[in-house]
Amino acid sequence: MSDFAFFALETLIKCIIIIAIFASLAGLATYAERKVLAYFQRRIGPDMVGPFGLIQLVADMIKLFTKEDIIPSNSQKFIFAIAPLISAICAFVSLAAIPMLPEFTLFGRVIQPIVADINVALLFVIGTSGLCFYAVFLGGLASNNKWSILGAARGLVSIISYESVGALALIAIIMLVGSFSLVDINNYQSDGFFSWLIFKQPLAFVLFIIALFIETNRTPLCLTENDAEIVAGYGTEYSGLRWGIFFIGEYTSMIAGAILVTLLFLGGFNSFWIIPGWIMMIVKSSFIFFWYFWARAAFPQLRPDQVMKMCYLILIPLAVLNLLITALTVLL
């Protein structure tokens, strides 16, 4: 087999594996969230369908597939129909440039667990994952529902504001490492525990985590939906499979965000003592992913004015200060 044919086959297989694994993980994440929230609230959670309630995932899938797909008569039907697909596609495309595990050898060839190792991977991931919000905005706008439009508008303002916070935090990382490549950022942290960038950039870590909660529409910083204020926000008019596709995209973005935090700040897939790198990657990403559930259970939903004041009066000044300190450190 020629090198080009092997490369094409390898890329195709990687894409299929990533879509299959992360679509399955998105479903498992809904089960995990229900179980974790139940534990926090001293409830049992799903436990009736299958062992430990695991088959509840299949029951939920059947329910979504068989529900009536309703499109409001006064909506922008085409945009309303494709908005969930935009969310899922952008979430999966962002995974293409994220290195998941250490490279390994198969059939005498070195395999990198990444679809495309590009030298501007960080820009690619942030750009494509940021496009997911267009699905939320377009879906809410096309629904012709006041709650959906309010949710889309609130989300638009918050995303634009907090992307500045996340970008300033990432610029500090890029200044230290000197590269946009996620592989280079991972390798920069290969000298041991204290080479992890969380110790060199603790403020950037906190700022990026907060921005990530906004990007993935997670409580307590989610403005796009709120049961007490705007019902389900942008998703008020969605039902059945389209609603499910929206949430596959959302949970895939959450998983991608947890992996990205691990690569940027927590040593990536480098081995730790006698623990292999792939195990470290799974453990650290799972720990970050757990934070989504913990924050939802522990903190109340913030008001829109509180979220925006925190951004412009606290987080952006801190991000600029962190950037200046990092620049001085690099120069000196």
Curated annotation (Swiss-Prot):
It comes from Campylobacter jejuni subsp. jejuni serotype O:23/36 (strain 81-176). The keyword Cell inner membrane applies. This is NADH-quinone oxidoreductase subunit H. GO terms for cellular component: plasma membrane. Disulfide bonds: none annotated. Keywords: Cell inner membrane, Cell membrane, Membrane, NAD, Quinone, Translocase, Transmembrane, Transmembrane helix, Ubiquinone. GO terms for molecular function: NADH dehydrogenase activity; oxidoreductase activity, acting on NAD(P)H, quinone or similar compound as acceptor; quinone binding. NDH-1 shuttles electrons from NADH, via FMN and iron-sulfur (Fe-S) centers, to quinones in the respiratory chain. The immediate electron acceptor for the enzyme in this species is believed to be ubiquinone. Couples the redox reaction to proton translocation (for every two electrons transferred, four hydrogen ions are translocated across the cytoplasmic membrane), and thus conserves the redox energy in a proton gradient. This subunit may bind ubiquinone.
